[in-house]
């Protein structure tokens, strides 16, 4: 039994290192993280055509009367899927599993508006190692934006600081400035405010930059 240090998102590729009973030890192809996944959570390899652009996209099933019925399952933001069939409102990505068309975009779509994406996660609870709608941490919040855009950045704050060559907290903040402390990272959304997954507040929250710097 161990703590969660990261999560793998639906549609991510990985390499299997070894099998242990009903589990596989894997290495995430995106950021190199090593972890474990249950056998039944592995799907056949596919070439993604689309990805989820909402915080949480509910999976629907089609009944005998051709009506779409909500299931209790969903895919998180940045999940990658291969569309098999579409109609006006829904697209099928697995056998009788459908997502709303408004929840997905083409796999090569680039979203340049960082605050727009991060605000999707507002009030999502803080969860160490989390990267999705049921909990996310500070470095996961930043990574998932770049991952959505098919751009690599490391998973952990200390490595993100090295990767972006951040040397010190600045006094002059513009939109999209990365602000870091030891073990914590936030992103400015304008000259006065930042957004971050903040442990003491237990959620993703927008706060005043100067007040936050003084508080941390």
Segments (PLM) and residue ranges:
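Hydrophobic beta-strand signal
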Residues: 15, 76-82, 180, 187, ...
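Short solvent-exposed strand/turn elements
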Residues: 28-32, 208-214
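Short, intrinsically disordered, charge-balanced linker/junction segments flanking boundaries
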Residues: 1-5, 213-216
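Boundary regions of SH3-family modules and the immediately adjacent low-complexity/disordered segments
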Residues: 6, 10-21, 27-59, 64-71, ...
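Short, basic/aromatic beta-hairpin or loop at an interaction surface
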Residues: 1, 49-63, 144-161
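Active-site nucleophilic cysteine motif
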Residues: 118, 130-149, 153
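Short alpha-helix capping/helix-loop boundary micro-motifs
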Residues: 1-3, 61-71, 161-170
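...with weaker cross-activation on analogous glycine-rich loops/strands in unrelated enzymes
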Residues: 151-210
